[in-house]
Curated annotation (Swiss-Prot):
Residues engaged in binding ATP: G38, R39, N40, G41, A42, G43, K44, S45
Family membership: Belongs to the ABC transporter superfamily.
Catalytic activity: ATP + H2O + capsular polysaccharide-[capsular polysaccharide-binding protein]Side 1 = ADP + phosphate + capsular polysaccharideSide 2 + [capsular polysaccharide-binding protein]Side 1
Protein name, per record: Capsule polysaccharide export ATP-binding protein CtrD
Main location (coarse class): membrane
Main enzyme class: translocase
UniProt superkingdom: Bacteria
SUPFAM superfamilies per record: P-loop containing nucleoside triphosphate hydrolases
Length: 216
């Protein structure tokens, strides 16, 4: 289970303190799939980072009783001076997983070839996303966080990502940030709308989208 309890997040900017999330609360059970809708700047990516543990909330608490992925295709944690393979080994040590399995899976899934042995700072954004997506799937989690990344690469690679995530791991929990109504209806059980840092929850996907589309 993931329990988000009265979570707020604020950052210090040149104009002073800016609150990005206001008193967010919800619970997610094992196997549940939740969609998050919101305009740019609504706080979606911030919420994903907090749930993953990349950042702590300013106030409130997030309780986790299941393993949670980092945001899929999030490459910000890579050390640019290290090769893709060195980053892979580092992640394997952190999560205590078999290096040979992760290496073989990543080589086959990412299709990066010899670029895996090049420094990550030489990668294009798409190559970094492929590596991050492959590593996210090579390390098994109870819950996967997806922040608008299913369109990584060409359509064939995107289809491969969808199969690995939504078919082979259909028993896992998913939090999906997307603007796509069809993706939400296909992959999620219910939806939440973030508006200016405030959360609105809907059990009916169409009602969530109706509210989302009514926003200015």
């Amino acid at each position: 289970m993931i329990s988000v309890e009265h979570v707020s997040k604020r950052y210090l900017t040149r104009q002073g303190w800016r609150t990005v999330l206001h008193d967010i609360s919800f619970k997610m059970e094992k196997g549940e799939k939740i969609g998050i809708l919101g305009r740019n700047g609504a706080g979606k990516s911030t919420l994903i980072r907090l749930i993953s543990g990349v950042e702590p909330p300013t106030t409130g608490e997030i309780k986790r009783t299941m393993s949670i992925s980092w945001p899929l295709a999030f490459s910000g944690a890579f050390q640019g001076s290290l090769t893709g393979m060195d980053n892979l080994r580092f992640i394997c040590r952190i999560y205590n997983v078999d290096i040979d399995y992760v290496k073989n899976f990543t080589e086959e899934f990412s299709e990066l070839g010899q670029y895996l042995y090049e420094p990550v700072k030489r990668y294009s954004s798409g190559m970094k996303a492929r590596l991050a997506f492959a590593l996210s799937l090579a390390v098994e989690f109870d819950c996967y966080l997806i922040d608008e990344v299913i369109a990584v690469g060409d359509s064939r690679f995107a289809d491969k990502c969808k199969y690995e995530l939504f078919e082979k791991r259909k028993d896992r929990s998913i939090i999906l940030v997307s603007h796509s109504h069809s993706a939400m209806k296909q992959y999620c059980d219910n939806a939440m709308v973030l508006e200016k840092g405030h959360m609105y929850q809907f059990e009916d996907m169409d009602k969530a989208y109706e509210y989302y589309n009514s926003l200015p």
